[in-house]
Amino acid sequence: MSLHLIFSPAGARACLHRWSADDRILLLGDGVYAANQFAQSHVPANAIYMLASDAEARGMTASEQGGIGLIDYKQFVGLTEKHSPVVSWKD
């Protein structure tokens, strides 16, 4: 059960080809702009999370996220503790 950290929209595209049903995805930094890509993909919304502070810093609101869960840093740490490996995707 992997945790995929998405730091850019390009990273999101690469991750979509390697995602498995028991994996989880976290959008961070500019990766939050990829929320729409995931909303239109085969990945269920309950498998995707977004760092709330990064979404807020980019002017995104919870209602715009299409069911993607907004989490804080404490919850981020919890995800890293529950999933292995943790894979980072950027460009």
Residue spans for each PLM region:
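Short, glycine-rich nucleotide/cofactor-binding loops
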Residues: S2-R13, I25, G29-G31
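Short, T/G/N/S-enriched strand-turn elements that build extracellular solenoid repeat scaffolds
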Residues: R13-R18, N36-Q40
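Short, well-ordered alpha-helix to beta-strand connector turns
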Residues: D22-D23, A45-N46, H83-S84
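Short internal beta-strands
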Residues: I25-G31, N46-D54
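C-terminal structural segments of small proteins and small subunits
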Residues: A62-D91
